[in-house]
Regions:
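Acidic, Mg2+-coordinating active-site environments of NTP-dependent enzymes
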Residues: 45-169
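ATP-dependent carboxylate-amine ligase catalytic core
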Residues: 1-68, 151
Protein backbone atom coordinates (compact mmCIF):
# COMPACT_ATOMS: atom_id res chain seq x y z
CA UNK A 1 0.00 0.00 0.00
CA UNK A 2 2.83 2.46 0.67
CA UNK A 3 3.78 2.35 -3.02
CA UNK A 4 0.38 3.91 -3.77
CA UNK A 5 0.22 6.27 -0.79
CA UNK A 6 3.52 8.05 -1.57
CA UNK A 7 2.50 9.46 -4.97
CA UNK A 8 -0.97 10.34 -3.69
CA UNK A 9 0.45 12.37 -0.82
CA UNK A 10 3.48 13.74 -2.63
CA UNK A 11 2.60 14.23 -6.27
CA UNK A 12 -1.12 14.65 -6.83
CA UNK A 13 -2.40 18.18 -7.24
CA UNK A 14 -5.95 19.45 -6.67
CA UNK A 15 -6.22 19.74 -10.46
CA UNK A 16 -5.40 16.06 -11.05
CA UNK A 17 -8.31 14.44 -12.86
CA UNK A 18 -7.00 10.92 -13.43
CA UNK A 19 -4.61 8.89 -11.31
CA UNK A 20 -3.36 5.52 -12.57
CA UNK A 21 -1.62 3.13 -10.22
CA UNK A 22 -0.64 -0.51 -10.10
CA UNK A 23 -2.15 -2.47 -7.25
CA UNK A 24 0.25 -5.29 -6.51
CA UNK A 25 -0.63 -8.10 -4.16
CA UNK A 26 1.10 -10.87 -2.26
CA UNK A 27 -1.80 -11.85 0.03
CA UNK A 28 -5.58 -12.12 -0.11
CA UNK A 29 -6.97 -8.71 0.86
CA UNK A 30 -4.03 -6.63 -0.40
CA UNK A 31 -5.96 -5.12 -3.33
CA UNK A 32 -9.03 -4.52 -1.17
CA UNK A 33 -6.81 -2.61 1.27
CA UNK A 34 -5.51 -0.35 -1.51
CA UNK A 35 -9.04 0.12 -2.92
CA UNK A 36 -10.26 1.16 0.52
CA UNK A 37 -7.62 3.94 0.44
CA UNK A 38 -7.97 5.21 -3.13
CA UNK A 39 -11.65 4.46 -3.94
CA UNK A 40 -11.16 3.66 -7.65
CA UNK A 41 -13.88 4.62 -10.11
CA UNK A 42 -12.59 2.35 -12.89
CA UNK A 43 -10.17 -0.56 -13.02
CA UNK A 44 -8.09 -2.78 -15.26
CA UNK A 45 -7.29 -6.41 -14.51
CA UNK A 46 -4.30 -7.12 -16.72
CA UNK A 47 -3.18 -10.58 -15.69
CA UNK A 48 -3.81 -13.49 -13.39
CA UNK A 49 -1.12 -16.12 -13.18
CA UNK A 50 0.78 -18.30 -10.71
CA UNK A 51 2.81 -15.45 -9.19
CA UNK A 52 3.35 -15.54 -5.42
CA UNK A 53 1.86 -18.99 -4.93
CA UNK A 54 4.05 -19.21 -1.83
CA UNK A 55 1.80 -16.61 -0.16
CA UNK A 56 -1.49 -17.19 -2.00
CA UNK A 57 -1.29 -21.02 -1.86
CA UNK A 58 -3.60 -21.58 -4.87
CA UNK A 59 -4.92 -19.96 -8.05
CA UNK A 60 -8.40 -19.38 -6.58
CA UNK A 61 -6.90 -17.06 -3.97
CA UNK A 62 -5.05 -15.15 -6.68
CA UNK A 63 -8.24 -14.80 -8.75
CA UNK A 64 -10.22 -13.70 -5.70
CA UNK A 65 -7.59 -11.11 -4.79
CA UNK A 66 -7.36 -9.62 -8.28
CA UNK A 67 -11.15 -9.34 -8.42
CA UNK A 68 -11.20 -7.38 -5.16
CA UNK A 69 -10.81 -4.46 -7.58
CA UNK A 70 -14.11 -5.37 -9.27
CA UNK A 71 -15.81 -5.56 -5.87
CA UNK A 72 -14.61 -2.04 -5.00
CA UNK A 73 -15.87 -0.22 -8.10
CA UNK A 74 -18.91 2.04 -7.78
CA UNK A 75 -22.05 1.92 -9.87
CA UNK A 76 -21.23 3.57 -13.19
CA UNK A 77 -17.63 2.40 -13.03
CA UNK A 78 -15.90 0.54 -15.84
CA UNK A 79 -13.85 -2.61 -15.44
CA UNK A 80 -11.43 -3.58 -18.20
CA UNK A 81 -10.44 -7.24 -18.53
CA UNK A 82 -7.63 -8.91 -20.44
CA UNK A 83 -9.60 -11.27 -22.68
CA UNK A 84 -6.45 -13.23 -23.53
CA UNK A 85 -6.12 -14.49 -19.95
CA UNK A 86 -8.10 -17.67 -19.21
CA UNK A 87 -8.16 -17.07 -15.44
CA UNK A 88 -9.63 -13.60 -15.96
CA UNK A 89 -12.23 -14.84 -18.44
CA UNK A 90 -13.25 -17.62 -16.06
CA UNK A 91 -13.68 -15.27 -13.10
CA UNK A 92 -15.39 -12.52 -15.14
CA UNK A 93 -17.96 -15.07 -16.36
CA UNK A 94 -18.82 -16.05 -12.78
CA UNK A 95 -22.43 -15.18 -11.79
CA UNK A 96 -21.16 -13.11 -8.86
CA UNK A 97 -19.83 -10.57 -11.37
CA UNK A 98 -23.04 -10.24 -13.39
CA UNK A 99 -23.79 -7.00 -11.52
CA UNK A 100 -20.25 -5.68 -11.90
CA UNK A 101 -19.95 -2.20 -13.40
CA UNK A 102 -19.60 -2.10 -17.17
CA UNK A 103 -17.33 -4.92 -18.35
CA UNK A 104 -14.99 -4.08 -21.22
CA UNK A 105 -12.71 -6.71 -22.67
CA UNK A 106 -9.50 -6.05 -24.53
CA UNK A 107 -7.32 -8.63 -26.20
CA UNK A 108 -4.51 -9.07 -28.61
CA UNK A 109 -6.24 -10.35 -31.73
CA UNK A 110 -9.82 -11.59 -31.25
CA UNK A 111 -12.13 -9.13 -32.97
CA UNK A 112 -15.74 -8.77 -31.83
CA UNK A 113 -15.16 -9.35 -28.12
CA UNK A 114 -14.04 -5.86 -27.12
CA UNK A 115 -11.03 -3.77 -28.05
CA UNK A 116 -8.44 -5.71 -30.02
CA UNK A 117 -5.24 -5.34 -32.00
CA UNK A 118 -5.07 -6.53 -35.61
CA UNK A 119 -2.28 -6.69 -38.18
CA UNK A 120 0.54 -6.62 -35.62
CA UNK A 121 3.89 -6.05 -37.33
CA UNK A 122 7.21 -6.10 -35.46
CA UNK A 123 10.44 -4.68 -36.89
CA UNK A 124 13.76 -3.38 -35.60
CA UNK A 125 12.15 0.06 -35.36
CA UNK A 126 9.25 -1.01 -33.15
CA UNK A 127 5.77 -2.47 -33.36
CA UNK A 128 2.75 -1.42 -35.43
CA UNK A 129 -0.84 -2.56 -35.01
CA UNK A 130 -4.42 -1.52 -35.66
CA UNK A 131 -6.81 -1.14 -32.72
CA UNK A 132 -10.42 -2.09 -33.46
CA UNK A 133 -13.09 -0.88 -31.01
CA UNK A 134 -16.22 -2.86 -30.09
CA UNK A 135 -18.24 -0.71 -32.52
CA UNK A 136 -15.81 -1.30 -35.41
CA UNK A 137 -13.88 1.97 -35.35
CA UNK A 138 -10.18 1.43 -36.06
CA UNK A 139 -6.89 3.29 -36.00
CA UNK A 140 -3.28 2.31 -36.79
CA UNK A 141 -0.69 2.78 -34.02
CA UNK A 142 3.11 2.67 -33.92
CA UNK A 143 5.33 2.33 -30.87
CA UNK A 144 9.05 2.01 -30.31
CA UNK A 145 8.60 -0.97 -28.02
CA UNK A 146 9.65 -4.09 -29.87
CA UNK A 147 7.56 -7.22 -29.56
CA UNK A 148 3.98 -8.34 -29.98
CA UNK A 149 3.85 -9.14 -26.24
CA UNK A 150 3.83 -5.38 -25.54
CA UNK A 151 0.68 -4.77 -27.60
CA UNK A 152 -1.80 -5.95 -24.95
CA UNK A 153 -0.65 -3.32 -22.44
CA UNK A 154 -1.00 -0.56 -25.00
CA UNK A 155 -4.42 -1.79 -26.11
CA UNK A 156 -5.81 -1.60 -22.57
CA UNK A 157 -4.47 1.94 -22.18
CA UNK A 158 -6.09 2.92 -25.49
CA UNK A 159 -9.36 1.23 -24.46
CA UNK A 160 -9.47 3.11 -21.15
CA UNK A 161 -8.68 6.46 -22.80
CA UNK A 162 -11.26 5.85 -25.53
CA UNK A 163 -14.01 4.86 -23.08
CA UNK A 164 -13.21 8.01 -21.07
CA UNK A 165 -13.89 10.17 -24.11
CA UNK A 166 -10.64 10.49 -26.05
CA UNK A 167 -10.63 9.72 -29.76
CA UNK A 168 -8.45 6.98 -31.17
CA UNK A 169 -6.46 9.61 -33.06
Amino acid sequence: PMGVVRPIRGSLKPTTEIFVCEMGARHVGDIKEICDMVHPEHGVITSIGPQHLETFFNMENIQKTKFELADALPEGGMLFFNGDNDYIQQQAASPEYDQTPEKIFYNSETEGTGYCAKDVKVSQLGTEFTVVTPDGESERFQMRLIGAHNVSNVVWAIAVAHKMGLTLQ
